[in-house]
Amino acid sequence: ELSNSLINAVYQDRKGFIWIATENGLNKFDGTRFSIYRHNATDSTSLKNNYVRTLFEDSRGNFWIGCINGLQRYDRATDNFHELFISRKDGRKNPHITSIIERRNGDLWIATSGQGAISLKKNSNPASFHIETELTDRIGSNYLNVIFEDSRQNLWIATEEKGLYRYSPESKELKSYKAPYHIAGDDV
């Protein structure tokens, strides 16, 4: 049985497990039964928060979990979660993760609600996050819902109130797509 009926994401990993992100825990279905992962305040290797927003497995087999207060990586060998700390110069940390992608070049890009876009260069060890301040300043919003890379390696960024953007990380070109006057808003 699922931990909650409010589902934010469903994801199948390369081993065939179905993962379900809910607003009250993370569920893993092995084809027969569900395992439920929840936050445990006395266990630093438990799920960081029960409100799980997004799930993603990268090309190296790392399984990422985005919660409303940070990013974790799941360790299959130990069945534990490890937090990756993301800090900004202004002292803010533990962003609300809304979307995670891997670009064709192997870099991870992370959309957040409140702290803009974050990138993680492929093979950076230890994990070195780059807050994409210039990009979010140009967009005019730190509230990003979804990030997607197209076949031309452009990033498409859907915001909560500023519409849709196409961004080329290489050329830094940014194109805005706003709602026509007869649509109620630019929440994408």
Predicted segment positions?
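Carboxylate-rich, polar loop motifs that coordinate divalent cations or form catalytic acidic clusters
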Residues: 1-188
